[in-house]
Structures are given as C-alpha cells and as structure tokens.
Amino acid sequence: MAEEEEALRRHNQAIMRLKLFEKDISRIEACMGRYSIRKFPKAYVIANCSDLQEGLRTWFKLSSTIPGLDMAYFYNVLTYTGQDLEEKETQLLLYEGLEKGLGQEFNRSLYSMTEEPECIYTIIESEYTHPDFDMIHKMVQWAHKHGLEPMERVYANDMTSFFAKDKTTYCLEIYMPFKRIASPV
C-alpha cells in the first residue's frame, strides 16, 4: 500500500510540474515584451543564496531530501540604482499551493512567505539568466511614463530557455515593486 501511495504522489507531482510549465508558457505568450502591473507571487522562501550557483547547489540538495521541491523557482534579486544593476542574491521560491503535493516531509512552518507588493511586470528574452541594465531601464521609463515610481529592487525569474540561431535564449519574468503612484509627466 505504501508503494502505491508513493507512486500516486510522484504521479501527482508530475502533473503539477506539467501544469506549472503550461502556465509559464501561457504567460510567456501573453506577456512577452509587454509591461503591466501585477502582484509579486505569494510563495514560500525555501532558501536565500548568495548567487545562482549557490542556489543551484541548494536546490539539488533540497530536491533530494524533499520530493517535489524541484518545483521551486529561482528568483535572482537585483538592485537598480539608475546608474547600475547589481546582483544581490538568489531566492528559491515555492509558489503557495504547491506544498499540498509535497507530502509530510515539507514543514511549511519552517519557511517565511514572500510579501505581495504590486510590481511593474514584464517578460523579456535575454542571452543571459539575468536582465541587463538597459532592459530594466526601459521598464523604469515605462513606469515613469505611467506615473509610477519604481523601487530599486528587481526580481528576475528564468522561466525557461530555448536554443535558436546557434545560441541559448532565456525567457525572464521581471518584477519591480513601486512605492507610490506619482503624477504622470
């Protein structure tokens, strides 16, 4: 009976992964190159890591101890100053609702939840796993044009990647909180 329950859980996790991928692809198709306002996703902060490499090591370690944690997303946290774009850390986030498919090994009380500020939102294609300064600067210009005052924090999620024209292209989901609505200029 235990074997069947474990097989069922693995099957349910596979379905959850497929639904996540389907949702990501739909969002890419709908939001690529468009700016909008969207709340930052509610998620469990599984780990705060110094950079993407440490995030990958942590992800592999956690995924091997708690089945299903491979569904965590890597959010690179950056700071935009108007002059520079600097990497701060990488967060491993597990979207709220996915914990239901992880089983008893996942103790949700051990993890804090993300805040859900309203953010300037877009999805962009990039040659890199991080956005560059110009990409974020364009986002800030859009915000100012619409009377929004962006904060310095930028969250970049590498949703997926593909190989085309002899290079890898990453689809980056970008969130940039704003602190107030200013008068449009």
Sequence positions of predicted segments:
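A solvent-exposed interaction/effector surface
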Residues: 2-185
